[in-house]
Design a protein with these regions (language model features):
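Flexible phosphate-sensing "switch/lid" loops adjacent to ATP/NTP-binding sites
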Residues: 1-351, 358-359, 365-372, 379
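Repeat-solenoid scaffold signature
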Residues: 374-390
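Acidic/polar loop patches that form or flank catalytic/metal-binding clefts of enzymes
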Residues: 274-277, 381, 400-407
Length: 423
């Protein structure tokens, strides 16, 4: 492992009980709070998938593929990092087990291990630790989110890697935040901590005691629940914070800041903290809760409608744009495969947005919707395939009735969009 910068501090965010409890939002929020106190923060997401990148993952199952400024196809959590921290993340901010394993095998085939028996421990874990050390050099604090839940078979090597890394760089330079889910049973009208207890025990079995436990719940769980988590988690009560569901993810930094988590981390990591400047988050909160006099209705013509996370960054960008224009926003989803049968339904929208996609399914519907926007002088934003749809629609309206693109039909005569030589 390359020797990490000794002055840099590391915060590892793990989760227990189940996935999807908000590790990414929590990591981004903690980073935002520390940045508001004057620190230079970087973030990294580690996923235990054997995929090389997120570009081929099913968006209906996994959510959107977030593309970084240097072209890396990554997890949607990196979008949270960019929006919350106001930074540009790069391919160094995304680590998938498949890519690390591919590179490890390539090095073994090239003889770089000099005949050693290459194993998950120490070789794979060493490679993971190198990813931690090399990602975003120069930051004061590097936050690493470990995907999945502690105890998952596929994620064992990542948890072992953060344990080893903590010992190597010094425990005074590492902090651990563990998210647990606390379910509410309506029958008995109480929150149950047993799943959280088991999740904390799983983490301790790896030799890791969390510095902060974040208890996710539907509503405020109450001090008695926090005391129970504190006792079974082996951490002081002030190190247990309750994170109930929020109306908007942009409220989370303010919620976490009230828990003084930044002061807890500063004490553990010996961090210099300036006075927090949370004005931007308070301003966002005011925009979220404001009653707007005017509401803009936007129709999104898309085909991956099984999972709203498929177009997460598109939706968030629309919301942020609406706040800046001081208007409310109503988004309606329109099935690209059905819209062509009833274009009249589009009359009620103030504008259309057609995002990217792959394959020919639903393309004709997108082209029809784009053509309707052109002919009715409606504001239109086409992203990726959505822009192709607009160009094709314009060509067809202009008389090229069979207009298409090389991506959709590489043998067509009337291609109005071509592929670049390196595509």
């Amino acid at each position: 492992m390359n020797q990490p910068h000794v002055q840099r501090k590391y915060i590892f965010v793990t989760g227990g009980v189940l996935s999807g409890v908000g590790k990414g939002i929590t990591a981004a929020s903690v980073g935002a709070i520390l940045k508001a106190r004057g620190l230079n923060v970087s973030v990294q997401k580690c996923d235990p998938y054997l995929n090389v990148d997120a570009g081929t993952l099913n968006p209906a199952e996994h959510g959107e593929c977030f593309v970084t400024c240097d072209g890396a196809e990554t997890d949607l959590d990196l979008g949270h990092y960019e929006r919350f921290l106001d930074i540009e993340v790069t391919q160094q901010s995304a680590t998938l087990a498949g890519r690390v394993l591919r590179d490890l095998i390539a090095n073994e085939r090239a003889g770089k291990f000099l005949g050693e028996t290459v194993q998950m421990v120490p070789h794979f874990t060493n490679a993971i630790k190198t990813e931690f050390a090399n990602s975003s050099p120069g930051s004061d604090i590097h936050i690493v989110e470990i995907g999945g839940t502690v105890g998952d078979y596929e994620g064992l090597s990542f948890v072992e890697a953060i344990r080893e890394f903590s010992a190597e760089v010094g425990k005074e330079n590492c902090a651990f935040i563990h998210l647990v889910y606390v379910p509410y049973l309506s029958a008995s009208k109480e929150y149950k901590t047993k799943p959280a207890q088991n999740a904390m025990r799983d983490l301790r079995s790896f030799g890791i005691v969390p510095d902060v436990i974040a208890a996710r719940s539907d509503d405020l769980a109450g001090e008695s629940v926090m005391k129970k988590i504190s006792m079974f988690g082996g951490v002081p009560l002030e190190s247990v914070i309750n994170l109930p569901n929020a109306d908007s993810i942009y409220q989370v930094p303010l919620t976490i800041e009230k828990s003084h988590i930044d002061q807890l981390l500063a004490k553990k990591l010996n961090l210099p903290l300036g006075k927090p400047d949370m004005r931007v988050w308070k301003d966002i909160y005011n925009k979220i809760t404001k009653h707007y006099k005017q509401t803009v209705k936007i129709g999104i013509v898309a085909k991956y409608l099984d999972n709203e996370d498929t177009y997460y960054s598109v939706v968030e960008s629309l919301r942020i744009a609406a706040w800046h224009q001081d208007v409310g926003l109503e988004i309606n989803w329109i099935d690209a495969e059905k819209v062509g049968k009833n274009l009249k339904q589009l009359d009620k929208y103030d504008g259309l947005l057609i995002p990217g996609g792959f394959g020919t399914r639903g393309v004709e519907g997108k082209i029809a919707a784009a053509g309707w926007a052109l002919e009715n002088n409606k504001p239109y934003l086409g992203l990726c395939l959505g822009l192709q749809a607009a160009v094709i629609a314009a060509a067809r309206i202009g008389g090229v009735k069979n207009a298409t693109s090389a991506e959709l039909d590489d043998s067509a005569k009337d291609q109005v969009i071509y592929l670049m030589p390196d595509q």
